[in-house]
């Protein structure tokens, strides 16, 4: 069960009615020590890379898929909302919206830190490439007798039934489909992520988080997809590949991604953004999600908050740094350099 929910409930209530400048909330969060993360790292034998770099924890951020507009973003930043950073969605295969594009300078000038997100291919709960059934509505014409006595007559009616049929191949212009999950597509999407991040003017060393939604089963082909994505970003050398992942898949994905870092001669640990609702509290460190390697913890999903007269549907996160994608490392630190 979730513990110490008081501050989180206060934030939700303030979001509904609009609150003051929020300075006391931010300062109380920032006052927490990162020693908790270091203890968790020591206890599990894992590293807490971003937590190790700071002694001020608990930087609140939000993410929302559709850009709320400049006015809303500025109103939140200046109107008491406790959020120091925001997700920044690149146009990507499973998130083609371009609303965030070109907003890097606008948002940073407002004082926002940024977490760059690239929503790659997903399994959508099935085995990529395997035949699967989808519900299809089928219409048919049938005869029916209506009326009584001398007025009884035959009419035609259309009946719609839902049946399961084998899914067709992806449309020629499709960009997002479980059947696209493959190593070659991972490399293609990795190159696309790098190109789009560079086009928006992000500095070398910026972390790009590949969004991997929860998978009850993690197919080998998906593991090859995201490893190829990571290898491609590493090989380019300008940016750092990170991962957004659900806690259910986090350990396996982390081990896979870390192996790609080491194979590329990289000494850093990959930045991870872990989603888990249970136990979330805005005063906690990301590593308290249960994975000492977590740099960001997403703990509240699909809520609406209103600050300074602007309502936005958001997910709530806590990061070890004020700008999760700005990790403060050079883009190509290699073993032996």
Where are these regions (language model features)?
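Bacterial N-terminal signal peptides that target proteins for export
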Residues: 1-7
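C-terminal motif of bacterial Sec signal peptides marking the signal peptidase cleavage site
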Residues: 16-18
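Bacterial signal peptide processing site
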Residues: 20-22
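Functionally critical loop-and-helix segments that line ligand-binding/catalytic clefts
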Residues: 39, 45-66, 73, 257-337
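Substrate-binding cleft of extracellular glycoside hydrolase catalytic domains
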Residues: 49-225
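Acidic, His- and aromatic-enriched active-site or binding-groove loops in soluble protein domains
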Residues: 113, 119, 182-185, 189, ...
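Glycine-rich, charge-decorated loop segments at or immediately adjacent to ligand/cofactor-binding or catalytic sites
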Residues: 125-131, 249-261
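Aromatic-lined carbohydrate-recognition surfaces of secreted/lumenal glycan-active proteins
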Residues: 236-254
